[in-house]
Design a protein with these regions (language model features):
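Short, exposed beta-strand-loop hairpins at the edges of beta-sheets
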Residues: 152-158, 164-166
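Soluble periplasmic/extracytoplasmic beta-strand elements of cell-envelope proteins
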Residues: 23-25, 164-168
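Extended, low-hydrophobicity segments enriched in charged/polar residues
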Residues: 16-147, 154
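N-terminal signal peptide c-region/cleavage motif recognized by signal peptidases
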Residues: 9-13
Length: 170
């Protein structure tokens, strides 16, 4: 009996953590930029796993990103896809776009996800205006918590910025 219970616990733990494809599009809406009133911290990545060659995936939302063009009043700032394990505790991925200067990127932030019946999202994305000396002059921010349904495209609105996110099982 103890062996059966142990094997059930191990299989439950294995099921509790599953691999997902996460795809994010961060874009600017036609509105005037709204300052966050603060600059991103130097530790903006907060020990999150970076999205790099080891976990990046081919984006699938290219048609949706294509509709977010200047003639429609939008500008895509970041479009990335990656593989991420989701379980009972939140796991964070660090995303960025543009050239790094003094530890910061023009677009940088974290996407935190927690699995379960619904997927819990904690987004903290900074869109930085970097001056000619390489320092951040001002920033916009998307900091929101949401609940996502697996496989569904979700829109996160934040005034002058928006984000589309889809989390699908692999």
């Amino acid at each position: 009996l103890p062996l059966i219970l142990l094997s059930l616990l191990n299989s439950t733990a294995a099921l509790a953590e599953s691999l997902y494809q996460v795809e994010v599009i961060v874009f600017r809406q036609a509105a005037t930029p709204i300052s966050a009133g603060q600059l991103p911290p130097d530790n903006w990545a907060q020990n999150a796993l970076p999205v790099d060659g080891s976990n990046s995936r081919t984006p699938a939302l290219n048609a949706e990103a294509g509709k977010l063009n200047p003639s429609n009043g939008y500008e895509v700032l970041l479009h990335k896809a990656w593989a991420q394990s989701l379980g009972e505790s939140i796991s964070r991925a660090a995303i960025s776009a543009g050239d790094e200067q003094f530890g910061h990127f023009p677009i940088e932030g974290t996407i935190g996800l927690k699995g379960g019946r619904v997927i819990e999202l904690e987004s903290d994305i900074w869109v930085n205006q970097i001056d000619t000396s390489g320092t951040i002059a001002d920033s916009e921010r998307i900091k929101q918590s949401s609940r996502l349904t697996s496989g569904e495209l979700t829109f996160v609105d934040n005034g002058s910025l928006g984000m589309l996110i889809r989390v699908s099982p692999l």
